[in-house]
């Protein structure tokens, strides 16, 4: 039986659902982006829904120290500072998706790349002359660990913001945050938050 553990994190841009297998981060996304996985029935798994700071104490089932790591990462990220330590995570997907997500992680905090640029890199990795930007976009849509595996850093060829599961307003806010131009930050303190829900 597979165990799945869930916690929520309230960010300035909405509630984030975090999933772990008890050892590493397995999913992280804005709650309304893909539906509430914790509310789904898992016949082959044990589901424990943990909420708020109660989920982050060391006394919880299995310790679940991964939730502490993720909360620390998210706190730093949403304060407008690049997190120093990335929580341990495990990605599950097709071989193609895994290559796309691996290359995606190489895009630095505060930087962006286009779907076409990412497709070129993936094509080289796969020993192909070309790769469809649309195929890369489909793999990005399946990314289970948003923010940590930064699909929001991929933009359209003309610099336009397109295709983010969390919504384009949220994508714009995340990029502004990383580039130090978020009007809702005062240094590393949050002032007021744009309405992105």
Regions found by a protein language model. Give the residues of each.
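DNA-contacting interfaces and partner/effector-binding or oligomerization modules
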Residues: 1-27, 34
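Nucleic acid-binding interface residues in structured DNA/RNA-binding domains
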Residues: 7-9, 72, 79-197
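Conformational gate/switch positions in structured elements
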Residues: 11-15, 62-63, 153
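Residue-level marker of intrinsically disordered, low-complexity segments enriched
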Residues: 16, 64, 68, 188-194
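A generic structural signal for ordered secondary structure
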Residues: 17-20, 64, 136-137, 143
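Compact structured core domains
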Residues: 20-86
């Amino acid at each position: 039986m597979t165990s799945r553990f869930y916690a929520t994190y309230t960010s300035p841009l909405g509630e984030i659902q975090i999933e772990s297998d008890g050892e590493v981060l397995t999913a992280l996304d804005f709650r309304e982006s893909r539906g509430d996985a914790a509310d789904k029935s898992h016949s082959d798994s044990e589901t424990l829904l943990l909420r708020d700071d109660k989920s982050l104490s060391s006394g919880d089932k299995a310790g679940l120290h991964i939730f502490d790591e993720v909360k620390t990462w998210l706190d730093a990220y949403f304060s407008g500072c690049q997190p120093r330590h990335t929580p341990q995570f495990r990605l599950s997907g097709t071989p193609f998706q895994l290559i796309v997500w691996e290359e995606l992680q190489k895009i630095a905090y505060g930087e962006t790349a286009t779907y076409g640029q990412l497709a070129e890199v993936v094509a080289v990795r796969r020993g192909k002359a070309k790769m469809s930007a649309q195929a890369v976009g489909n793999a990005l849509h399946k990314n289970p660990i948003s923010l940590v595996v930064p699909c929001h850093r991929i933009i359209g060829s003309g610099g336009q913001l397109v295709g983010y599961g969390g919504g384009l307003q949220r994508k714009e806010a995340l990029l502004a945050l990383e580039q130090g131009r978020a009007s809702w930050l005062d240094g590393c303190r949050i002032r007021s938050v744009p309405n992105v829900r």
